[in-house]
Regions:
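Residue-level signature of mid-helix packing/kink "hotspots" within the transmembrane helices
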Residues: 12-20, 106-107
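Helix-to-loop junctions at the C-terminal end of transmembrane segments
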Residues: 18-30
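C-terminal ends and interior cores of transmembrane alpha-helices
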Residues: 40-53
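Helix-loop junctions at membrane interfaces in 12-TM secondary transporters
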Residues: 51-61
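Cytoplasmic helix-loop-helix junction between adjacent transmembrane helices
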Residues: 62-100
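Helix-loop-helix hairpin linking two adjacent transmembrane segments in secondary transporters
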Residues: 97-144
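Juxtamembrane intracellular "pre-TM" segments in multi-pass secondary transporters
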Residues: 147-174
Length: 182
């Protein structure tokens, strides 16, 4: 149990650190690609956990790979992608539905995951969940073709954007809040 707690702490830390990187990649390559890549990494990590041979396999699979994978299909990137394909007059309703769906998903997923562990054992439960998560990119097909958002402002490099954001106190406080609370 103690080692599993360490694995989950590593996952949370890697997830938190990789969030801004996922955002930068989404800006450069598009949200859909990052969402799909993240979901596939997440599925690979879950599958690897299911076939793991020792505790360090669990650290690498659930801690590192799943931590990185979770940074892709997050609300921020999903809402950004959805916002590009939904008309302005429906955007608030759709955003609310997406956000509520994530909460509802957690409400059902946690006890459902426990039922899977009890029915299949933890290894097969991870493999089953890996297959389920690997299907997630199919949902992103509906978001394809979203037009790129063109900025009227000057082009910035990633580092210029980071330095500008770092100089804004609101961004720093928001980042600290998310770092502490997730």
């Amino acid at each position: 149990r103690q080692f599993f707690g360490l694995v989950m702490a590593a996952q949370a830390l890697i997830y938190g650190i990789s969030q801004p990187i996922a955002g930068l990649l989404a800006d450069r390559y598009g949200s859909i690609r990052v969402i799909i890549a993240g979901a596939l990494l997440y599925a690979i990590g879950l599958y690897w956990a299911g076939i793991s041979g020792d505790s360090w396999d669990l650290m690498m699979s659930l801690g590192v790979v799943v931590g990185l994978g979770l940074s892709g299909p997050t609300q921020v990137l999903v809402l950004g992608a959805v916002g590009k394909v939904v008309p302005n007059e429906r955007r608030s309703m759709v955003f609310g539905t997406v956000i509520a769906s994530t909460s509802l998903g957690m409400f059902f997923f946690v006890p459902g995951g426990q039922q899977l562990v009890e029915a299949l054992g933890w290894r097969d439960a991870f493999i089953f969940l890996a297959v389920l998560i690997a299907l997630l990119p199919l949902i992103a097909i509906g978001l394809r073709g979203a037009p790129a958002i063109e900025s009227d402002g000057p082009k910035q490099s990633i580092w210029e954007a980071i330095l500008e954001a770092r100089g804004h106190s609101g961004y720093v406080l928001l980042t600290l809040g998310f770092f502490v609370c997730g």
